[in-house]
Amino acid sequence: MHPEILSITLFGIVAAFTPGPNNFVAFYSGFNFGILRTLPHIIGVTLGFPFLLLCLALGLINIFKLYPLIQEVLKYLGTLFLIYLAYKISFSGPSDQENKNKNPIKFHETFIFQFLNPKGVIASIIIVSTYINPGETFVSYTTQIIIMALIVSVTSITLWTFLGKFSRKFATNHKFINYFNYAMSLLLLTSIITFYL
């Protein structure tokens, strides 16, 4: 076992459970669409984030170091996608019937977004550059970190989804749901600002 697995896990927990784009969207989706219809988002994050870590460990991090402009472009693409999501969330309808006719974020959108999510990319770069070294232990360390990322990702994103679903019980009228959607949209936009500070 990796001697620093505890510190990696603690860092992963902090990065995964604290508010950020993935969690805000999971909360919103759980609130508006329920657990089952949010499963594609849960699976997309659960598989996408560890896959991002794996890609970085296998060499993507070196490309970012050689060509920092690529990482900047990804950050701006992620920002545009988050603005689009915030718009979509802000103007989603309050009624259950309207939500039945709408679709929550899809698996492939969430999976691809992991490569555009500034919070996730920064956390992944920190994990890979700090804890994974090329050499004899590369495969062992990388495998342990990927397993940890899978466990932490599925746990955090599922928790945020359940929190959203639970919060729906307090939604007694359409106005509340509209305000909730506006608040989630604003939180998503605020999370973008923090990437540029």
Predicted feature residues:
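Juxtamembrane transmembrane-helix termini in multi-pass membrane transport proteins
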Residues: 2-69, 126-145
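Hydrophobic residues within alpha-helical transmembrane segments
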Residues: 10, 39, 43-47, 51, ...
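Alpha-helical transmembrane segments and their lipid-water interface positions
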Residues: 22, 44, 48-60, 82-85, ...
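Selective transmembrane alpha-helices of multi-pass membrane proteins
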Residues: 65-94, 150-156, 160-163, 168-197
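A short amphipathic helical element positioned immediately N-terminal to and/or at the very start
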Residues: 107-115
